[in-house]
Amino acid sequence: MNGIEVLCQYQNGRKSFIRNSLSRIEIIQSDLSAVDFSRAELEWVNFSGTNLSRANLHRADLMHAKLIGTKLISANLKSADLSFADLSWVNCENAALVRADLIDTNLSGANLLKADLTDANLSGANLTGVNLSGANLSRANLSGANLTGVDLSGANLSRVDFSNANFEEANLVEVDFFRAEMSECNLQQATLIHTTLKGANFSNANLRGASLKGVVLKNLKNTLSMKSEFNIPELSQSDRLDLSGANLSGANLSGANFQNCSFRFAFMQKANLYKANLKDSSLIEVHLKNSNMQSANLNNSILSGINLQGTTMPDGSVHQ
């Protein structure tokens, strides 16, 4: 069947196209709401601008599909294969994308408000400017994904793999990063206010200019920590956040709770640590030049080889 035949049959009352082979058909700016394409072969189709709200695309093969500006509101895309597809400016509000394959998919400008992406694979996907507010990405794979300027406020990102992902200027307010893999991430100028980072791994992440005011970091479990080169028992604990080698230069960390955190070899020049809780933390070979540590809690912290030139100390004095 070609696109015209499918559309005519739909308009005449047919809603089920289960397991149909419909590769390369073109149906643009039409109404296919509530259609059933479950398990259908839809590789290379062009549904740009079409209304597929409430459609059933469970386990459909949509590799290389063109869905630019398509409406997929409340659609069922569970276990669908959308790898290499173009979903730019798509509306997937409240859509179910559980276990969906979105490898190298273009989702720039997409609306994924409250979408369920649990266990989805978005490695290498382009998520620039996407609205993921309130979305569930629990256990999803976003390694190497581009999330520049993305809105993830209030999203559940627990146990998500974000290694090497780009979060530059992203809105991460009140996001749950519980046990997330954030190593090598770019979080420059990102906003992480009131964000939960319990058990997350930020090894070698770049948080230059990021705002982490009010982040929740205490009582961490099962964090992936870098192996210590120092024979210090405290560093072998499994319940600490690892920010080893992270770039926090210029970051606003005022009032943040970093208790029992490892900052080994971190770059924190000009960082604002006013009233930050650094109790029991490891600050070995940290660059803190010109930072503000006024009223910070350093009780029982390990401090060794630190560059404190021009730093405002907890008592208000400036280190020379």
Annotate the PLM regions.
Residues 2-320:
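Tandem repeat scaffolds
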